[in-house]
Design a protein with these regions (language model features):
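Acidic catalytic motifs of isoprenoid enzymes
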Residues: 1-190, 197, 201-239, 244-258, ...
């Protein structure tokens, strides 16, 4: 369940940059308040996107406050007190916990085995709390894991079939961010399904050599591609096609807030994640001095 969606910094306006950073700090502080300091390191940029999408589709204007950032002494401007931010914090905890289960202990190096053991010990309480707060979301992740096991046992050669579990869970996850409008929910489910398929293919392509060496199921290995470079090129080609499909559904959304920021993330940011638009764009500093 990996894969990050973040803005494409070279094309981001200062206003949108500030909005994004305030949401990032807001989600991190929500995780700190609800689940403890250690849980904050689970935050990935997907959670920030979930919060922005949820609030923007519903037209919820967040409260902006200057509060202390977890792990820092200084106070920064951040967004708070919205349903989208609370949903994002819950999602990051549950998704982070299930990511810990993705690889077997036997496949990890000793240092990573120790790190996983510490994570599972210290994050257990946060996971249990998030699961109780949002049992429906926990069921989504559990179903995805069960479907993934079935696909591994089948050793499916069909790319769409192999990506189906992750595509389904992302589709269901994104549909929860929509309002009660059935058309909006349908569009968000399709967008999430495309994103899940994109990140599944890219993740499997990057793990081509490791999975082949460890005898783990990998759809690119089953299709006998000639090395990791060929797998990555194949994954990028399929992912770009999924991005084009996603764009048609995304353009149908009625965004009430943050439309330019979301356009940057969903169009340029996603394309950059699939096929880098500019060298070293990811090494840009996020915090303006």
């Amino acid at each position: 369940m990996k894969g990050r969606m973040r803005p494409y910094l070279p094309e981001l306006t200062i206003r949108d940059y500030n909005t994004y950073m305030r949401y990032l700090r807001g989600v991190r502080r929500q995780m700190y308040k609800s689940y403890g300091f250690y849980a904050c390191h689970l935050l990935r940029t997907n959670g920030v996107l979930f919060a922005i999408l949820s609030d923007s589709l519903a037209g919820r204007m967040p409260t902006r406050k200057r509060q202390r950032v977890p792990g820092m002494l200084c106070r920064r401007s951040m967004m708070c007190q919205t349903l989208g931010i609370r949903q994002a914090a819950q999602t990051e905890i549950l998704m982070g916990w299930h990511n810990l289960q993705d690889r077997k202990y036997s496949e990890l190096r000793p240092a990573k085995r120790v790190r996983r053991a510490v994570d599972k010990l210290l994050l257990r309480r946060a996971y249990d709390k998030a699961r109780q707060e949002n049992p429906a979301l926990e069921r989504l992740f559990a179903q995805e894991r069960e479907q993934a096991v079935v696909q591994m046992n089948l050793s499916a050669k069909n790319y769409a079939l192999a990506a189906e579990p992750m595509s389904n869970v992302y589709g269901a996850l994104y549909s929860t961010l929509a309002t009660d409008d059935p058309n909006q929910r349908k569009s968000m489910r399709y967008i999430g399904s495309c994103i899940g398929r994109i990140f599944y293919l890219l993740d499997k392509a990057e793990r081509f050599e490791a999975d082949r060496r460890n005898g783990q199921y990998n759809v690119f290995v089953v299709n006998e591609l000639n090395g990791q470079a060929a797998a990555i090129e194949n994954a990028r080609r399929q992912a770009l096609a999924a991005v084009n499909d996603l764009m048609r559904a995304y353009k149908m959304l009625d965004l009430k807030l943050n439309d330019t920021l979301l356009n940057n993330i969903m169009i340029l940011g996603l394309q950059h994640a699939v096929y880098p638009l500019e060298q070293d764009a990811d090494t840009e500093k996020w915090e303006i001095p």
